[in-house]
């Protein structure tokens, strides 16, 4: 094969050609071969570790699992927190369960047309400082298995709290460990709103007692946003809503 100017710079990666009885290979193909060789060496080193790791099972984050996540914001409030103390976020006295708010949420997220099951529930709290340029961290303590008749204190002394996660958002898994049996939640909610939470929600999910504090040595004003996050499993309706040639 004679000399050809078109073969000086190959348009195809990894192609070879023969010019004056000499074999030529594109530089990109050579660099790719070096990269692939490094990848094969790295895979050979980690392969024994992966063989051992395949024998173990680890739990995944249930928040990122299958299902639809829906949120209801219970309240937003500004609180004053004293140093070296933790303040109760909510005592479940009733302001978290306003009928107008929950009725709108249930009717929008749990329609009658589909069967929906609550797979899991989280208590989410988001905290932000009210004053700018404040350098402190947020601390937190919570309890799940408190007795129903226990009256929590509004303020407790900070003893071995932990820091709230990234972006000042913390989620607490409230699932007790067994499945939530109800399928048509809106009809149950409409039938007995007064006893819905005590008879339907809390038997299957924990009612947390959450305390929030700061690492500041001064009294700080913080903004709390408290929400419930539901993971919902949806099922198709049993029968079509309409009958006719178009359906």
From Swiss-Prot:
It holds the Pfam family Polyhedrin. The keyword Disulfide bond does not apply. GO terms for molecular function: structural molecule activity. InterPro entries: Polyhedrin. The keyword Cytoplasm does not apply. Keywords: Viral occlusion body. One of its GO terms (cellular component) is viral occlusion body. Belongs to the polyhedrin family. Component of the virus occlusion bodies, which are large proteinaceous structures, that protect the virus from the outside environment for extended periods until they are ingested by insect larvae. This is Granulin. The lineage of its organism: Viruses, Viruses incertae sedis, Naldaviricetes, Lefavirales, Baculoviridae.
């Amino acid at each position: 094969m004679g000399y050809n100017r078109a073969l000086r710079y190959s348009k195809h990666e990894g192609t070879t050609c023969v010019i004056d009885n000499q074999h030529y290979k594109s530089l990109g193909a050579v660099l790719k071969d070096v990269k692939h060789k490094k990848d094969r060496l790295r895979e050979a080193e980690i392969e024994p570790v992966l063989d051992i790791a395949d024998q173990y099972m680890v739990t995944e984050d249930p928040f990122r699992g299958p299902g639809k996540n829906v949120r209801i914001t219970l309240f937003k409030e500004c609180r004053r927190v004293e140093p070296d103390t933790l303040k109760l976020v909510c005592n479940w006295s009733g302001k978290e369960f306003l009928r107008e708010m929950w009725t709108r949420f249930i009717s929008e997220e749990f329609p009658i047309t589909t069967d929906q099951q609550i797979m899991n529930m989280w208590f989410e709290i988001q905290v932000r400082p009210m004053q700018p340029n404040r350098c402190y961290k947020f601390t937190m303590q919570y309890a799940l298995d408190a007795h129903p008749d226990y009256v929590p204190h509004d303020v407790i002394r900070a003893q071995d709290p932990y820091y709230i996660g990234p972006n000042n958002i913390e989620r607490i898994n409230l699932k007790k460990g067994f499945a939530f049996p109800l399928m048509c939640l809106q009809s149950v909610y409409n039938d007995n709103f007064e006893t819905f939470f005590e008879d339907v929600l809390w038997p299957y999910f924990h009612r947390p007692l959450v305390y929030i504090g700061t690492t500041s040595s001064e009294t700080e004003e913080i903004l709390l946003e408290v929400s419930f996050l539901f993971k919902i499993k949806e099922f198709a309706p049993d029968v079509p809503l309409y009958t006719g040639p178009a359906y």
